[in-house]
């Protein structure tokens, strides 16, 4: 069966792909042509299989809401739509443009971000729903709603964070398979953290950012460090940095919606989540500007720091955004992670690249891993110290397990959630990374360069 599919794809591919040597400014040999054709076929088959699997699951296990199968008030789910679209903007525009900083990889960055997001959205809805049904031992048709769609975008966020670590080094085919496997492990960790440990993590500091970052870092370690010759295009230029800053601004504006999208309105939780995120991300922006001026080697503003460290407060406030936190505490969290992120970009990442042979293209260690850990720790600290009276009747809505757990026990479970996200992310990322490095996959020949996979209408040497 697979041979017939492959033969059909070969026939179609040979008819529609005849690359011109002029488009690439390189000499094409028969071997190179066959290699390119095979790479294109592998990608098309992988993508077709992935989408077909999603179609099969949606046909068998999901249905649209109707008066016959759903008695939930329509207004109660449509109230999530505004937040859903804000999260959508972050996933497709924010993340997409944030990754366009590489001077010769902007087309790939924004386009592959688009592809990964749409695959993750579908597969995330399926796997998160299935993990809850399998573990909960209730196998029924899932009636879709807007919160479920938001969970799909959250899953996409985790994969796009990992994408940042391998940006420019993994082929589109490898990225399709990375997405497929990562979403499965993401769903397992999400179920463990939220359902087994009963930890609270409204904005995903642990489930999304910590997991996605450690998964991506493990994958990039497994793939190895590009040679000095391959690193030649791992740089930015004036216009690519400006485009990346557009992504930063979209992410910065909509992060309060991301953190509060699924927060319940009872007990002023959603209001707290929005305001905590605003204060924290504003503070991280201010401290990042100050830190880059002081710590950068040229004593000037570094666009890498401004594009990324300014967002660290949004990541760090994810777990604690709807908890008993004051404005001053939220600002303190933002100030700390803004400075720490700049320190990471300036001093930590270069040393880790030498010691651990880790090539982190977007610096997700400093934007997602470290702030995610700080956010998880902040959530645990608040859990240990906050009074139950603060939450009133909404206590068990914030902490589902507090109906039978002490405050101390809940704090320890919050810490276990951090360990789970780090551990599952690291181990699964290493396994998937070794799989992607195997002989089953063609490796990226022209790293950080669009020309290997994209038609280049006009080639400019910059």
Q: Predicted regions span which residues?
A:
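Hydrophobic alpha-helical transmembrane bundles of multi-pass membrane proteins
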Residues: 2-462
